[in-house]
Amino acid sequence: MASLILLTLKTMQSFNPPIRTLMGPGPSDVHPRILSAMARPTIGHLDPAFVGMMNETKEGLKYIFQTENELTMPVSAPGSAGMETCFANLVEPGDKVVVCINGVFGMRMKENITRFGGEAVVVEDDWGTAVSTDKVEQALKDNPDAKILAFVHAETSTGASSDAKALCKIAHNNDCITIVDAVTSLAGTELRVDEWEIDAIYSGTQKCLSAMPGISPVSFNERALTKVRNRKTPVTSWFLDLNLVMGYWGEGAKRTYHHTAPVNTLYG
């Protein structure tokens, strides 16, 4: 067996991916400067030099999101993990959540709600059209006990963009916090987290940021974090529990070890 493993290792070729111009719904082309940055020497995720870079990364993400939210950070996993970070922390068993579906990723939001024990109230629009503000307003009036409004800002599956500013205003008028999918929209279209009073938002580095896949920028305001801190039940995911992650990524945190961050990916 040992000789077979050795033979396999000797015959394996280094992978040389073909050069492509990426035009699909997945990753975008990555600039050579970013690829070069990821090839730099690996240092520890608690190294003072890396901690300094973490602070710079947070500030850069704040600018892109147009926010001063203290908890603005990159989740060490792709955009789907950013989505789960929002729902795992903000949805408790029995919570009623109004979720807008006008494409694939609204459907994924609904699945997250049910997996975390929430009750999904669906507002459905035709694929390729924007989320109807009138339908959302009616759904919230019909469900005054709803705690969250969740919607996709720009649906990757169709390209349809919805009025995030108006939807957030409707949510707050009905005492709901908002979860916004900005995987496709961040850095690609106007997005103002603070001005539009978005409570929780997630994105991905592989779309309009034209960076490597595998990182999910997220941002939470104080209204969202208050709900996280006041949960009656523990967050079901240890890895995504913001109460733990804030010790590493939170503003003024001691950078307490939680998990090994993807150091070289964050260089990019």
Residue ranges of model-derived segments:
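A glycine-/small-polar-enriched, mobile loop at the entrance of the PLP active site in fold-type I
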Residues: I19-S76, S80
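Active-site phosphate-binding strand-loop segment of PLP-dependent enzymes
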Residues: V131-A187, A200, C208
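Active-site C-terminal subdomain of aminotransferase-like
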Residues: D29-V30, Q206-G268
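General beta-strand structural signal in soluble alpha/beta enzymes
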Residues: L22-G24, M73-S76, V99, V122-V123, ...
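Conserved active-site segment immediately N-terminal to the catalytic lysine
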Residues: V193-Q206, S216
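Basic/polar N-terminal segments that are highly enriched at the extreme N-terminus
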Residues: M1-P17
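Conserved beta-loop-alpha segment that forms the PLP phosphate-binding cup at the N-terminus of a helix
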Residues: E68-V98, N102, G106-E111
